């Protein structure tokens, strides 16, 4: 209990049956005295007046309207008609007039004061009225030999007064400063009652609970220190000043490159001129749709230079949510990165991609001036930001330049932000702190450190260290995942969003790091209060003092009434940093922004017109120093993991998804026995069916049924496309009846309390079916079980390997923590894998520990069992290749064989942005890359009738690098596409070097074309290849941890009995499913005719609970094959990536085709079989299809799967930034050879996937369309209602 808490009135209780005190070790030891300047003769009914005044005072501090007061009344002229001691129960009605209220106290039934008997209810405090000083103790009839805290002793000083009031309190429970303030408030109440007795004018009881004159005087002293003035500058002007003062200082240091202040200014000026051409001017919004990137800062500054206002759009949020934001702000233009082009298209806005085409000619000047529209004024809009709203729409507000700049220097000083700070840009773009971190840093001359999104998910600590960030702004939950000892670069930590514990602060302070707390509202730019945290803080809830605002504590239900100092109330904020109000929401604005409270007019005068913000936060003053302590939130506003949300907005979308006219509620619930863990957002849905009625009990909740689980999962899936993830409930509960209060209102608290009696597993059972317990079977599984138990505060043996990590209480934050803990145990997992395989069993299958692969035998006396191939080739020789030029020779892998056989040579045009590349420097860089990666020097000749991969030492100078001038009138990119389209028509021999880089130059632009055989690459390695090229171009060393030769040797060594036996068992009695058998036309003839392409886009798609999207794709295709071929047992092929399977260091950076085609076999159980097979085959997925057919089946030699699934779960579009130059992948040109096989390619998107069917020539277009439609429809049904599809398939 802290010294500011006041549940002290209920500590000692009178035992009703014996009339004596309970034992209490709490002894009053702090005495406070004041004088009440009224005459005793003026007080009628002194006992009633003083008891009523004390009850009114306590009611204000306790927020209570009914109190029991113990009293002693003695030594008063020997009047024995009044009881000497007893208790009285007093009800406080704030709207009641004072005199009638006092009359009720006096009258209290027919007997008046004489009904207050000593045998009454236990009192909550004691008050004594005595004629003269009789010592420090109360009348013995009140408490015998024991003491009670607090005690009030009132003694008159003669007939003329004043009264002397003495209060005695336990200082461990009531701080002396608070006790002093309470006595002044008591004196104020007494005077008000006395005036009410003699005055004709009516006053209300609530007027007695308003702040006392002494309290107001103290407030004015404190608030003079917080007074703030407006700053009339514009943000872009302040940033421009920084750019001029320190042009060569680092402005942005990001994962994708960096900008000096001069470079930033130039880039932003160039983009600003384009924005002006699109009509951007003051009060027009530009939406910024970027992932974490250095280009976000450029876009922000460009919009400001053009005179416009910006709104940051977080690409992780649903398109519908972002579209609503664009509509509300009337967005005139959208700037987006190439990675977010598809999402931008869904928002249907005019869009400019950033970075765009390279500059024409020299770097643009930074001397940008607006000529075509009025100059930007400080009152113009700076940005809009959005939070959770109560109407079902996002709640947006506008911050202007004045609001942001006012108090900025005070903010910087208070938070330790200066020109030497390196600010870690952690906050999501959907939250206001991300904007402050950008703009404030640029104004003071700091460096903005921008991590990659992947690093924020998987390795925050490593990212901070790599960027050498010195200034962090994190929630305490995130800070707990970091080890300050491994971050010597950090100097300042700002904790936001949640209450920090003493242990949070101590962990960082022990390493000499300054820890501060920042409290504020998004509607108040930059934040409101800063507190210096200490491991010795008595009250972790202390949020400090305002740095550019004045805070007032008012009655939560009546902002015209200031609360006494030390009492809790709603924080009302007066500040020049406030926003203008809520966009297109006048009702919400009127509720939140209030003008001219009556008390403020008395303080400021009639000229006060600035609105004040009702924050919704319940706070109280620290009576010692005027700082604020945060107590909680008001009404239906809640905070979950540091993020504010309106329950009404969640409920609006729930009703919409459920099409319900019944009340649907949402609330934050703390599951049973989970103190210290994150609570859950839970939805309560009315539900009644026959099973619920049959199982009816006295409880609120119906038992979970399959039908409810299916509907609940579907609703959550729809919500994920409408709301940000933190606003989507973790579960839905089936409620038989909604409880109501006596007045008919919904009784939220009873529902919340009932749900809090359930465990997390019981809560999650409403969306997930019951799964029997499975104990861990391997050491890997036991490690994961222990790690989850430690992170989630659950006994390890209570966790089943079939449990869903997120159903156990995991979230995106604990997923990051699990990655860190797992890596400490030597387990390589990522956040993405946790989301894809949320069960512990699935996660254990995803991880490939090197020890397991080490079991693959390798002859000790023959370090390279394939060396004989190289020796034989050197001895026998090959045409066109000198023996001395042969560096290595190996058998080809299965996918290499198929692509070399079909002469698959592909072309990749690459856009160059940011400057011209030097041709000679690029040639030398490409030479270094070819020497570093042997696969680029590999050719694929036939040797003894079979393809081999042969690595040559020197590929020659004739064709590996070219420089081409684009014809006049064509850009480099246009000519690159033309060259690729022409070159693809010619067959390129693969028994000679294929890898080639072409530099295309045009006036003011350049482009690259990369030519590779598909036997040399896969889609995952192209970005790393181009990144290595740019590293070599800028003179940095190339580090190759593993190459494709090592990968090939590892795969070829897997021809061992264990692996072959697995595939024999797996494929026993099967045969490849021939989709072509249902087609018309000659299969052999189809091998010579080009294939046709058919494309569909599937939106609003999410995998069912416990399954991945890849599993659903394969299950849907297997259902299509069953439907087309009438076969119960189907076998098809799947292209898999083996980078996660091979036990080689940094396998993700290998340049080469680390992929394979393996068979997929599915019986009647679609989803379950596919998911199980995925886990089983990962141990054996590096053996080629030809080896499987030859050694593990009775199929004819050369059998291939008739249809092959390719699920591209990697980034198809990418760009590489290095040294001010950006290389951007654009549409590739593939050499599509004729084939009789059917390929289904699925590419995940933000909201679903794109499906492409590559049909052989003997499949008619009508048939192909029907097959693809059937696949897409099945895919959608499986995602939304797998049970329905499975029932239909039986």
From Swiss-Prot:
<dbReference type="GO" id="GO:0005737">
    <property type="term" value="C:cytoplasm"/>
</dbReference>
<protein>
    <recommendedName>
        <fullName>Nonribosomal peptide synthetase 6</fullName>
        <ecNumber>6.3.2.-</ecNumber>
    </recommendedName>
</protein>
<comment type="function">
    <text>Nonribosomal peptide synthesis (NRPS) is a key mechanism responsible for the biosynthesis of bioactive metabolites which are potentially contributing to organismal virulence.</text>
</comment>
<keyword id="KW-0436">Ligase</keyword>
<feature type="region of interest" description="Disordered">
    <location>
        <begin position="1"/>
        <end position="27"/>
    </location>
</feature>
<keyword id="KW-0596">Phosphopantetheine</keyword>
<dbReference type="InterPro" id="IPR009081">
    <property type="entry name" value="PP-bd_ACP"/>
</dbReference>
<feature type="compositionally biased region" description="Basic and acidic residues">
    <location>
        <begin position="852"/>
        <end position="870"/>
    </location>
</feature>
<dbReference type="Pfam" id="PF00668">
    <property type="entry name" value="Condensation"/>
</dbReference>
<dbReference type="InterPro" id="IPR023213">
    <property type="entry name" value="CAT-like_dom_sf"/>
</dbReference>
<feature type="region of interest" description="Disordered">
    <location>
        <begin position="846"/>
        <end position="870"/>
    </location>
</feature>
<feature type="region of interest" description="Adenylation">
    <location>
        <begin position="260"/>
        <end position="657"/>
    </location>
</feature>
<dbReference type="GO" id="GO:0043041">
    <property type="term" value="P:amino acid activation for nonribosomal peptide biosynthetic process"/>
</dbReference>
<feature type="region of interest" description="Condensation">
    <location>
        <begin position="914"/>
        <end position="1162"/>
    </location>
</feature>
<dbReference type="GO" id="GO:0019748">
    <property type="term" value="P:secondary metabolic process"/>
</dbReference>
<dbReference type="InterPro" id="IPR036736">
    <property type="entry name" value="ACP-like_sf"/>
</dbReference>
<dbReference type="InterPro" id="IPR045851">
    <property type="entry name" value="AMP-bd_C_sf"/>
</dbReference>
<dbReference type="Pfam" id="PF00550">
    <property type="entry name" value="PP-binding"/>
</dbReference>
<dbReference type="InterPro" id="IPR042099">
    <property type="entry name" value="ANL_N_sf"/>
</dbReference>
<keyword id="KW-0597">Phosphoprotein</keyword>
<keyword id="KW-0677">Repeat</keyword>
<dbReference type="GO" id="GO:0044550">
    <property type="term" value="P:secondary metabolite biosynthetic process"/>
</dbReference>
<dbReference type="GO" id="GO:0031177">
    <property type="term" value="F:phosphopantetheine binding"/>
</dbReference>
<feature type="domain" description="Carrier">
    <location>
        <begin position="775"/>
        <end position="851"/>
    </location>
</feature>
<dbReference type="GO" id="GO:0019184">
    <property type="term" value="P:nonribosomal peptide biosynthetic process"/>
</dbReference>
<dbReference type="InterPro" id="IPR001242">
    <property type="entry name" value="Condensatn"/>
</dbReference>
<keyword id="KW-0843">Virulence</keyword>
<dbReference type="Pfam" id="PF00501">
    <property type="entry name" value="AMP-binding"/>
</dbReference>
<dbReference type="InterPro" id="IPR000873">
    <property type="entry name" value="AMP-dep_synth/lig_dom"/>
</dbReference>
<dbReference type="GO" id="GO:0016874">
    <property type="term" value="F:ligase activity"/>
</dbReference>
<comment type="similarity">
    <text>Belongs to the NRP synthetase family.</text>
</comment>
<feature type="modified residue" description="O-(pantetheine 4'-phosphoryl)serine">
    <location>
        <position position="812"/>
    </location>
</feature>
């Amino acid at each position: 209990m802290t010294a500011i808490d006041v549940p002290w009135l209920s500590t000692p209780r009178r035992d009703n049956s014996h009339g004596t005190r309970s034992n209490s070790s709490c002894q009053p030891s702090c005495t406070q005295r004041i004088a009440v300047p009224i005459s005793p003769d003026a007080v009628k009914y002194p006992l009633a007046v003083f008891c009523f005044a004390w009850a009114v005072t306590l009611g204000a501090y306790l927020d209570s309207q009914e109190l029991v007061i113990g009293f002693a009344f003695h030594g008063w002229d020997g009047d024995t008609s009044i009881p000497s001691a007893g208790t009285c129960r007093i009800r406080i009605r704030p709207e009641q007039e004072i005199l009638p209220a006092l009359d009720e106290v006096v009258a209290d039934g027919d007997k008046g004061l004489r009904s207050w008997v000593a045998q009454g209810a236990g009192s909550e405090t004691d008050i004594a009225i005595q004629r003269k000083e009789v010592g420090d103790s109360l009348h013995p009839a009140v408490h015998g030999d024991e003491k009670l805290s607090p005690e009030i002793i009132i003694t008159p000083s003669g007939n003329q007064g004043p009264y002397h009031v003495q209060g005695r309190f336990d200082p461990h429970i009531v701080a002396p400063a608070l006790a002093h303030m309470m006595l002044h408030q008591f004196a104020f109440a007494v005077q008000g009652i006395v005036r009410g007795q003699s005055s004709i004018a009516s006053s209300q009881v609530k007027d007695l609970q308003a702040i006392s004159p002494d309290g107001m005087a103290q407030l004015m002293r404190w608030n003079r220190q917080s007074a703030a003035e407006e700053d009339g500058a514009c943000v872009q002007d302040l940033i421009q000043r920084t750019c001029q003062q320190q042009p060569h200082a680092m402005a942005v240091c990001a994962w994708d490159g960096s900008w000096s202040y001069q470079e930033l200014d130039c880039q932003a000026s160039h983009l600003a001129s384009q924005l002006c051409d699109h009509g951007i001017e003051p009060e027009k919004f530009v939406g910024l749709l970027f992932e974490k990137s250095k280009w976000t800062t450029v876009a922000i500054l460009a919009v400001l230079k053009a005179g416009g206002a910006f709104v940051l759009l977080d690409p992780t949020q649903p398109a519908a949510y972002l579209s609503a934001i664009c509509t509300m702000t009337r967005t005139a233009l959208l700037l987006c990165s190439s990675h977010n082009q598809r999402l931008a298209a869904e928002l249907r806005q005019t869009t400019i991609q950033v970075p765009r085409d390279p500059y024409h000619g020299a770097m643009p000047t930074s001397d940008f001036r607006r000529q075509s529209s009025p100059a930007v004024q400080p009152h113009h809009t700076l940005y809009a930001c959005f939070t959770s709203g109560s109407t079902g729409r996002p709640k947006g507000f506008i911050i202007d330049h004045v609001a942001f700049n006012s108090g900025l220097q005070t903010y910087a000083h208070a938070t330790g932000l200066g020109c030497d700070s390196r600010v870690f840009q952690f906050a999501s773009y959907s939250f206001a702190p991300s904007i402050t971190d950008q703009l404030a840093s640029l104004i003071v001359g700091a460096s903005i450190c921008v991590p990659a999104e992947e690093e924020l998910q998987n390795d925050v600590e490593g990212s901070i260290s790599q960027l050498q960030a010195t200034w962090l702004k994190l929630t305490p939950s995130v800070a707990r995942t970091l080890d300050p000892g491994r971050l010597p670069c950090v100097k300042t930590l700002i904790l936001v969003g949640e209450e920090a514990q003493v242990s949070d602060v101590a962990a960082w302070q022990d390493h000499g790091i300054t820890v501060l707390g920042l409290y504020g509202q998004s509607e108040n730019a930059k934040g409101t209060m800063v507190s210096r945290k200490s491991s010795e803080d008595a009250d972790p809830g202390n949020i400090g003092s305002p740095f550019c605002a004045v805070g007032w504590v008012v009655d939560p239900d009546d902002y015209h009434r200031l609360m006494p100092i030390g009492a809790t109330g709603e924080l009302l904020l007066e500040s020049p940093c406030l926003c203008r109000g809520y966009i297109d929401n006048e009702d919400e604005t009127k509720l939140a922004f209030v003008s001219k409270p009556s008390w403020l007019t008395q303080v400021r005068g009639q000229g006060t017109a600035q609105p004040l913000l009702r924050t919704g936060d319940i706070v109280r003053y620290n009576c010692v120093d005027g700082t604020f302590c945060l107590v909680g939130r008001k009404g239906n506003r809640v905070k979950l993991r540091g993020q504010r949300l309106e329950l009404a907005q969640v409920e609006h979308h729930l009703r919409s998804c459920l099409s319900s006219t019944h009340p649907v509620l949402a609330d934050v619930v703390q599951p049973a026995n989970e103190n210290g863990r994150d609570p859950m957002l839970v939805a309560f849905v009315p539900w009644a069916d026959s099973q619920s009625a049959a199982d009816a009990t006295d409880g609120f909740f119906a038992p979970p049924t399959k039908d409810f689980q299916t509907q609940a999962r579907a609703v959550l899936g729809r919500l994920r496309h409408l709301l940000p993830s933190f606003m989507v409930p973790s579960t839905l509960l089936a409620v038989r009846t909604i409880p109501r209060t006596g007045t008919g209102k919904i009784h939220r608290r009873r529902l919340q309390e009932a749900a809090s009696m359930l465990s997390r597993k019981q809560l999650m059972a409403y969306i997930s079916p019951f799964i029997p317990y499975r104990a861990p079977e391997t050491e890997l599984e036991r490690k994961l079980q222990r790690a989850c138990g430690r992170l989630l505060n659950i006994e390890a043996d209570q966790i089943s390997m079939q449990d869903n990590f997120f159903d156990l209480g995991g979230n995106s934050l604990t997923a990051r923590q699990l990655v860190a803990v797992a890596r400490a145990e030597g387990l390589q997992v990522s956040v993405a894998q946790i989301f894809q395989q949320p069960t512990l069993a699935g996660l254990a299958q995803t991880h490939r520990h090197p020890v397991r692969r080490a079991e693959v035998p390798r002859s000790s006396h023959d370090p390279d069992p394939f060396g004989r191939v190289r020796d034989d080739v050197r001895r026998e020789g090959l045409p066109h290749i000198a023996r001395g030029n042969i560096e290595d020779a190996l058998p080809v892998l299965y996918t290499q064989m198929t692509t070399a056989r079909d002469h698959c040579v592909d072309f990749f045009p690459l856009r160059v942005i940011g400057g011209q590349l030097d041709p000679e420097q690029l040639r030398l860089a490409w030479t270094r890359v070819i020497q570093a990666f042997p696969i680029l020097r590999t050719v694929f000749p036939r040797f003894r009738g079979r393809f081999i991969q042969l690595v040559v030492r020197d590929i020659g100078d004739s064709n590996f690098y070219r420089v081409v001038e684009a014809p006049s009138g064509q850009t480099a990119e246009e000519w690159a596409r033309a060259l690729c389209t022409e070159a693809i028509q010619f067959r390129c021999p693969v028994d000679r070097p294929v890898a080639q880089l072409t530099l295309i130059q045009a006036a003011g632009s350049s482009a690259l074309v990369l030519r590779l055989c598909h036997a040399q690459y896969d889609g995952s390695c192209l970005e790393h290849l181009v990144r290595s090229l740019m590293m070599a171009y800028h003179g940095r060393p190339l580090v190759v941890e593993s190459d494709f030769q090592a990968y090939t040797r590892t795969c070829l060594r897997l021809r061992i009995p264990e692996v072959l036996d697995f595939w024999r068992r797996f494929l026993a009695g099967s045969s490849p499913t021939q989709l072509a058998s249902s087609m018309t036309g000659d299969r052999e003839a189809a091998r010579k005719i080009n294939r046709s392409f058919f494309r569909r886009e599937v939106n609003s798609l999410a995998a069912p609970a416990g399954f991945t999207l890849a599993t659903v794709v394969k299950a849907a295709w297997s259902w299509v094959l069953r439907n087309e071929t009438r076969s119960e047992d189907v076998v098809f092929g799947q292209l898999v990536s083996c980078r996660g399977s091979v036990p080689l260091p940094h396998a993700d950076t290998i340049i080469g085709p680390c992929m394979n085609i393996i068979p997929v076999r599915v019986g009647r159980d679609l989803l379950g079989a596919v998911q199980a097979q995925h886990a089983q085959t990962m141990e054996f997925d590096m053996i080629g299809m030809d080896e499987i057919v030859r050694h593990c089946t009775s199929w004819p030699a050369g059998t291939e799967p008739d249809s092959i699934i390719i699920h591209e779960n990697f980034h198809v579009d990418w760009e590489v930034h290095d040294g001010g130059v950006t290389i951007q992948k654009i549409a590739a040109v593939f050499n599509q050879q004729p084939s009789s096989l059917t390929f289904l390619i699925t590419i995940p998107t933000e909201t679903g996937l794109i499906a492409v069917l590559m049909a052989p020539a003997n499949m008619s277009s009508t048939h192909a369309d029907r097959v693809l439609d059937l696949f897409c429809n099945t895919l959608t049904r499986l995602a939304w209602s797998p049970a329905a599809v499975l029932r239909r398939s039986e």
